[in-house]
């Protein structure tokens, strides 16, 4: 079974829609193998998003991701990476299909409610960033 990482970002946590988002995953065949609510440090956010360090939005992204708690989860299921990305919708909520997480809960391209791994390779790296093997059941 494939695994992927999901992050419910500070904007969605603040809105109180954690349960609704996790329910969407489960309703669509993704099992929650691990989940925890954490407060990222600036260093952790910089490390996690290091791939974007030379992009103009990097500083704002880091500041946003440390602005409040996040919920990190390992989702497991058939085609988990693709299924999660379909459930999330387009990065820009204005372009996200109706019924997707971002269309329903995101405010902007920056405060876009959720993060999801974009490949199996990145999913493995991202999961290992947040979870030890003993935390994934």
From Swiss-Prot:
InterPro entries: NDK-like_dom, NDK-like_dom_sf, Nucleoside_diP_kinase, Nucleoside_diP_kinase_AS. Keywords: ATP-binding, Cytoplasm, Kinase, Magnesium, Metal-binding, Nucleotide metabolism, Nucleotide-binding, Phosphoprotein, Transferase. The keyword Nucleotide-binding applies. One of its GO terms (biological process) is GTP biosynthetic process. ATP binds at residues 9, 57, 85, 91, 102, 112. SMART domains: NDK. GO terms for molecular function: ATP binding; metal ion binding; nucleoside diphosphate kinase activity. Homotetramer. Belongs to the NDK family. This is Nucleoside diphosphate kinase. It comes from Campylobacter lari (strain RM2100 / D67 / ATCC BAA-1060). The lineage of its organism: Bacteria, Pseudomonadati, Campylobacterota, Epsilonproteobacteria, Campylobacterales. The gene is ndk.
């Amino acid at each position: 079974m494939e695994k992927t990482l999901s992050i419910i970002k500070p904007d969605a946590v603040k809105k109180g829609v954690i349960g609704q988002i996790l329910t969407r995953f489960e309703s669509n065949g993704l099992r929650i193998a691990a989940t925890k609510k954490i407060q990222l440090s600036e260093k952790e956010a910089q490390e996690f998003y290091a791939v974007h360090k030379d992009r103009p939005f990097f500083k704002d992204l880091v500041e946003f991701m440390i602005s409040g708690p996040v919920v990190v989860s390992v989702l497991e299921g058939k085609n988990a990476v693709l299924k999660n990305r379909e459930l999330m919708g387009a990065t820009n909520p204005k372009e996200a299909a109706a019924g997707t997480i971002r269309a329903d809960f995101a405010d902007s391209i920056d405060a876009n409610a959720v993060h999801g791994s974009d490949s199996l390779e990145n999913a493995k790296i991202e999961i290992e960033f947040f979870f030890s093997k003993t935390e994934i059941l």
